[in-house]
């Protein structure tokens, strides 16, 4: 399984590490992914999902069902 959020699709970002002498080297900025077991109210069941912390904060604010629908994700597959 890839290192991507299953709800938002967020994945690693290519960036540059810049030293004091301004030598630039490539680096990969990974997403802060967490494995969480969330209660899905509409489906009346627990959902195991790999999710970014940014998406987790949004879910706490608006709810899992509403957030999944806004991102076009079907929670039945989890």
UniProtKB/Swiss-Prot annotation:
A GO term from the CC aspect: ribonucleoprotein complex
Keyword Oxidoreductase belongs to the record: no
Keyword Ribosomal protein belongs to the record: yes
PANTHER family: 39S RIBOSOMAL PROTEIN L28, MITOCHONDRIAL, LARGE RIBOSOMAL SUBUNIT PROTEIN BL28M
Coiled-coil intervals, chain numbering: none
HAMAP family on file: Ribosomal_bL28
Alphabetized UniProt keyword annotations: Ribonucleoprotein, Ribosomal protein
Disulfide bonds: none
Family annotation (Gene3D superfamilies): Ribosomal protein L28/L24
Protein name: Large ribosomal subunit protein bL28
Organism annotation: Prochlorococcus marinus (strain AS9601)
Superkingdom, natural source: Bacteria
Entry's Gene Ontology molecular function annotations: structural constituent of ribosome
């Amino acid at each position: 399984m890839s290192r991507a959020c299953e709800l938002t699709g967020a994945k690693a970002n290519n960036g540059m590490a810049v030293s004091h002498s301004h030598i630039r080297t490539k680096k990969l900025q990974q997403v802060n992914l967490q494995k969480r077991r969330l209660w899905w109210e509409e489906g009346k069941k627990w959902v195991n999902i790999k999710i970014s912390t940014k998406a987790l904060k949004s879910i706490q604010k608006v709810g899992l069902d509403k957030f999944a629908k806004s991102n076009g994700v079907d929670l039945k597959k989890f």
